[in-house]
């Protein structure tokens, strides 16, 4: 079942926490819809800021929105002007006081959502999907990821029939609950239609008790940009795999 389920939802309450933390009474449905609007608005408004997670916490009169990003300087702006504007805009959505916290992602190469969106942008810029995926895999492995798997589906290279093609390096044990696996899905909009990109990144294994907060281990930042360098790590063999379509050309030789 680990191959079929969402790796994040499958580990909730074990090694992962929830991205929405509040008590819902009779207006539970309204709060769910409001959370969706907040996340959709932030991702659209801050599309150039490399936003990954939007974590929402609620009290009776306050909504706390925590944004994890690789480029906090874009969100904060000069003297905090941009974050103040965002706060006022979110007040109109929630009709409550809004507090915004910003956390920096120091190694965006290990964030599945940022890796998936980066691949999408390159495909939309007409870069070969194989080149974009292999570069993303190499960057993640350089940052000491234990494994990464990427699956792309759609009309690859403009083919008439849609198919799926995958790339894998290292180990990604989806059935091991203690495995810290990040997962994301993103879509690339091309002239041939939409392409779906799924990314799984294995960061390591968790032993013993762990803080289930979604922000466990992250540092709060006021400004600056994400990034950082990591040492080289031993890699497994890269294993391309196909689902449907033509078999791998290397196998026909």
From Swiss-Prot:
CDD domains: KH-II_30S_S3
Gene3D superfamilies reported for this sequence: 3.30.300.20, Ribosomal protein S3, C-terminal domain
GO term, biological process aspect, one: translation
GO MF term set: mRNA binding; rRNA binding; structural constituent of ribosome
Annotated function: Binds the lower part of the 30S subunit head. Binds mRNA in the 70S ribosome, positioning it for translation.
Family from the record: Belongs to the universal ribosomal protein uS3 family.
Name of this chain's protein: Small ribosomal subunit protein uS3
Native species: Flavobacterium psychrophilum (strain ATCC 49511 / DSM 21280 / CIP 103535 / JIP02/86)
């Amino acid at each position: 079942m680990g191959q079929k389920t969402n790796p994040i939802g499958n580990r909730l309450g074990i090694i992962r926490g929830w991205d929405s933390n509040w008590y819902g009474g009779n207006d539970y449905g309204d709060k769910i819809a409001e959370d969706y609007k907040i996340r959709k608005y932030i991702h659209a408004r801050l599309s150039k800021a490399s936003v990954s997670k939007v974590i929402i916490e609620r009290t009776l009169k306050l909504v706390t929105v925590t944004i994890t990003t690789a480029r906090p300087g874009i969100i904060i702006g000069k003297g905090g002007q941009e974050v103040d504007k965002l706060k006022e805009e979110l007040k109109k959505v929630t009709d409550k006081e809004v507090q915004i916290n910003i956390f920096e992602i120091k190694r965006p190469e290990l964030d599945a959502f940022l890796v998936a969106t980066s691949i999408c942008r390159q495909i939309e810029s007409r870069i070969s999907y194989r080149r974009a995926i292999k570069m993303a895999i190499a960057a993640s492995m350089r940052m000491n990821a234990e494994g990464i798997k990427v699956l792309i589906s759609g009309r690859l290279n403009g083919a008439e029939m849609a198919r799926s093609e995958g790339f894998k390096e290292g180990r990604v044990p989806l059935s091991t609950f203690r495995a810290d696996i990040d997962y994301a899905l993103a879509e690339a909009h091309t002239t041939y239609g939409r392409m779906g990109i799924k990314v799984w990144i294995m960061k390591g294994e968790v032993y013993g008790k762990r803080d289930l907060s979604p922000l466990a281990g992250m540092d709060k930042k006021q400004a600056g940009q994400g990034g950082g360098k990591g040492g080289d790590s031993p890699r497994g063999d890269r294993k391309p795999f196909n689902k449907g379509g033509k078999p791998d050309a290397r196998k026909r030789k």
